């Protein structure tokens, strides 16, 4: 698997990085068992380097299946794996509550797939409000679990990974974390490579952790084009933010 080789490359380069994967990449479309077998191979490789794997969330048709696989990994003793939760889904608050019970590390994003109104908030203001609620839950969860921080080599993240380029969402998280007493290095902001580098640099200057999401492998361009095609709003987001470097 190319993903397994990615860990060798990260280690050889000495970069502060871990790996995110989509379960559709590793056999979920064939069967849950095939996917789980491949995922364990990846996690064992990550463990050999004391590294971490983040399972990306895809469209809502496989949300529950993705969470079930994460739970199966937990039952098998894997603790170097985390998940992504999408704020635009109605179910996300309940999912985060359960994930925090097991101290999972959670990346929170708004959500980029087109979903029906009975599954996801159709209005952006509602998505934003839910993002803030979910971010507060993760910050509180980090406090409850002893404020675990990023590992010294940057491979293992803290519990809250707040993936957003929205300054209002970032400001909310900063203010809320300070209010409840979560240290700056007990959460991280996450952004796409090349998007709002000015904001990334400013956050680092302020003492916050910033992780940059970099597509890798030979199929990065088709992946990028699919993400734009999945939802027309993605194109406007990319163009408007790319030129605000």
Briefly describe each language-model feature range.
Residues 1-245:
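Positively charged, amphipathic and often flexible ligand-engagement surfaces
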């Amino acid at each position: 698997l190319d993903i397994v080789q990615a860990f060798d490359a990260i280690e050889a380069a000495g970069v502060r990085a871990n790996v995110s994967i989509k379960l559709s990449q590793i056999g979920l479309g064939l069967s849950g068992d095939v996917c789980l077998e491949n995922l364990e191979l990846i996690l064992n490789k990550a463990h050999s380097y004391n590294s971490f794997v983040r399972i990306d969330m895809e469209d809502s048709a496989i949300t529950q299946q993705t969470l079930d696989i994460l739970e199966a990994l937990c039952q098998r003793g894997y603790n170097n794996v985390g998940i992504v939760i999408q704020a635009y889904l109605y179910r996300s608050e309940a999912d985060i509550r359960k994930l925090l019970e097991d101290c999972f590390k959670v990346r929170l994003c708004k959500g980029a797939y087109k979903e029906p109104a009975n599954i996801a908030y159709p209005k952006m203001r509602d998505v934003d409000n839910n993002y803030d609620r979910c971010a507060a839950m993760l910050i509180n969860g980090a406090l409850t679990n002893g404020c675990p921080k990023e590992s010294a080599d940057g491979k293992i993240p803290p519990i809250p990974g707040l993936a957003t380029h929205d300054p209002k969402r970032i400001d909310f998280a900063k203010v809320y974390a300070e209010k409840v007493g979560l240290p700056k290095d007990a959460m991280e902001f996450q952004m796409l490579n090349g998007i709002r580098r000015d904001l990334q640099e400013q956050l680092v200057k302020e003492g916050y952790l910033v992780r940059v999401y970099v597509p890798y492998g030979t199929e990065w361009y088709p992946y990028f084009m699919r993400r734009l095609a999945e939802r027309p709003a993605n194109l406007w987001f990319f163009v408007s933010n790319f030129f605000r470097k």
